[in-house]
Amino acid sequence: MNSTTMNIPAQAQAKFREGLALHQQGQLAPAQALYEQVLQLIPTHFDALYLSGVLAAESNNPEGALVMFDKAIDSVPTHVNAHIDRGMVLCKLGRHGPALQNFEKALTLAPNNSEAYYGLGSAHMQMEEHETALQYFDRALALAPNYPEAHGDRGAVLQSLGRLDEALQSIERAIALAPTVEVNHYNRGFVLSALGRNDEAMTSYDKAIELKPDYATAYNNRGNLNWTLTRHRAAIEDFDAALSIKPDLPDLFGMRLHMKMAVCDWPALEAQKKLLVEMIDRGERAASPFAAMAALDTLDMQRKCAQIWLKSKRVAGAALGSLRKPPRHKRIRVAYVSSEFRESPAAYNMVGLFENHDRTRFETIAISAGPDNPGEMRSRLKRAFDVFVDAGKKSDIAIAALMREMEIDIAVDSMGPTGDDRTGIFIARGAPIQVNHFGFASGASHFEYIVADPIAIPPDHRAYYLEKMASLPHTLFATDRERRIAERTPTRAEAGLPEDGFVFCSFNNSYKITPEVFDVWMRLLNKVPGSVLWLRGTNSLMPGNLREEAHKRGIDPARLVFAPIAPKMEDHLARLRLADLFVDCFAFNAQTTASDALWAGVPVLTCLGPTMVSRVAGGLLNAIDMPELITRTHDQYEALAFSLATEPRRLAQIRAKLAENRLCKPLFDTPLFTRHLENAYTQMYERYQADLPIEDIQVRA
């Protein structure tokens, strides 16, 4: 044997020590080069194999890491950390089954290894098996009480389970042990925001971004929080930052576009909408279905967006197992699921429905999936139901499991994929019959039925919906005929309106206002001397942007009047009487605000569009027998608005008819609407109990 051969082990060990020192200093590339030299000398050198795997994992090369960990395990099959690290890499790749096998093998080699238990918890957390994950994190912490990663991920799991106070304790323990780990500050911000402790949440997001300046999800969540806190400019800046860092962050592009629409920032609007369509056509999750409803003007694109969004939502509904058929109940158990069971537009519309249910035939349950905001409306809602479940802090899976325990027959989604999305409850199958009462093209197989009406969802739109139709004869939206209007109507001067000029009104949410409808409104102001446009000031940036747009169109910005939020709903309804004509938006109609105007006696002018949300107001007008206010083209809309603004007698006739129809036509006949909906529920239930296939349901007038 020559001297060179005799020195190979010593050469290899020297190079390994040099590589290890560089690795520990964070110099990954030169360290890797030295590990490779070691392996050229001794291909089975375990430490070089193992640390090459660690280095590859640190370099975001998981496939390369797997190759090296496999070689390391072949060299030393009993090395515990090699099995654990291989399992963590497999978790990163989403290969959870093999990862679990590695962690379990590690535990057979070292039964009290806290890192192996942590790995099992991580895998089950990623599989959204949160209860199982929690058990493993607890085992890890029983063995290693000062394990910061286990505390942090335990907090994340508790957050997913809706156990927010416990989650906060775990996350804060993790921060105390490892104060520079950015994800724990991010998770702390998320939990604090959910608890309504917004200022503290903001501090946590700030810290997360300070520790990781390219933390896109932290910018995204801080943007949402800034919007909630009415810091609108800061919110958009945060969304811009998130988009520049991670353009493919799920839903981010659509949310930023939605915010731009909300502040009426239009210079790049059409280009952004076109880009959104291209992203959805490529199958990218670029927007939530709610954001898409305002930005996309075809049912086909709205459905595509919804299907992509649902496909990527990883809710472990299978964890609950198959749904057992509940026994026939004396009263049909109907659960309404919403995060809006508080002072909210949805609650003002729907509370009358809940109060009018036939309690001899239906047992009504409220699943309140949002915050508990005490107030007059919350109290009224609690009285309206047989059972009121405050589930705001529960996870989607926990709520679905609870609904199964309660043997709910029919679960009604009364909110859809809004900001407080709880779609997971329905994906996890809380009831055997699930009903979409939000009206959007969900693309979802977890709803059996969608509530429809002849205008909002006409027969030729049927192909865009997977659900069977439960068609009501007049309107699919509930109203409350008991809504009080304050006796005193404020003066026009008090509302900032001219005493004599014609008042066009549109209290729509600002994201519904588009350049197309604004062009029409400005032409109307130009053609009707002394007229004004009365809008709702929904955020701090919208008035300035719209005034600038008016100026561009040659209209004095002072002719745009922005109403503040009224202290009480009854005061808002009273001030609506000051308007002469409510002019609707095109792509996304007024719903609650149109109902408000009609209840206050103000005519609503609308134009039917190609999507459900662009036909809603038409459905309301049809139900109050005012078809003469439904137009089919933008030109017709503009011509009729001008006619009503310049022909006082014609407008007076319209207002007189509205006053007469208000209490004698179906729109505000809450008991009648309730009977029709109950008819639909009964047909759904009887078909299910008889094991008949799901079919369209037509409720007759």
Residue ranges and their predicted role:
Residues M1-L497, N509, D519, E548-I555, ...:
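Alpha-helical solenoid repeat scaffolds of the TPR/TPR-like class and their adjacent stem/linker regions
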Residues Y117, R361-E363, M522-K552:
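A conserved nucleotide-sugar
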Residues R333-A335, C505, W534, L605:
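Short, well-ordered beta-strand segments
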Residues M415, D584-A590, L608:
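Short Ser/Thr-rich beta->loop micro-motif in glycosyltransferases that lines
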Residues C505-E516:
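Substrate-binding clefts and catalytic carboxylate motifs of secreted carbohydrate-active enzymes
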Residues V583, A597:
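Donor-sugar nucleotide-binding helix/loop cap in glycosyltransferases
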Residues C607-L608, M612-V616:
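Glycine-rich phosphate-binding loop and adjacent beta-alpha segment
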